[in-house]
Amino acid sequence: MTASVSYSTIGRIGTILVDSPPVNALSHSVRQGLVDALNAAATDETDITILRCEGRTFIAGADISEFGKPPQEPSLATVLDALESFPKPILAAIHGTALGGGLELALCCDYRLAIETAKVGLPEVNLGLLPGAGGTQ
């Protein structure tokens, strides 16, 4: 895992925690941490994994500081593939905003639980852009 993503267990429940202020953007560090945490969770004795985030947002999408730079693996598509093929149920605990790639990530989880004030969306479509990982498919 990375400093931005941690994995812990309590009993038979695993928790992947994203903590990458200010908005938990999907930076290379977060993407790598998610893949590492999913790999750890897949092989332990837990029955379910919860994906949650610290701070005021769930995940607010791409890290704009990485725009214009060469892409680095794991890509968002790689992370989403890891979620979709995860062998145990995974629940996204959504608060704040889940935008763009953050919403796509939540949609790849088996279950989504959102607080009443949570907001989700694909703002890139308002600019005539397709979501980066196929969120409209």
Language model features: what each stretch is:
Residues 33, 52-82, 98, 126-129:
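Glycine- (often His-adjacent) and acidic-residue-rich active-site loop
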Residues 16, 51, 63, 105-106:
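Hydrophobic/aromatic residues within transmembrane alpha-helices
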Residues 136-137:
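Hydrophobic, secondary-structure "cap" segments at the distal end of domains
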Residues 1-54, 81:
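Conserved CoA-thioester-binding segment of acyl-CoA-metabolizing enzymes
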Residues 83-132:
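Glycine-rich beta-to-alpha active-site loop
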Residues 23, 56, 61, 117-119:
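A short, glycine- and basic residue-enriched loop/turn
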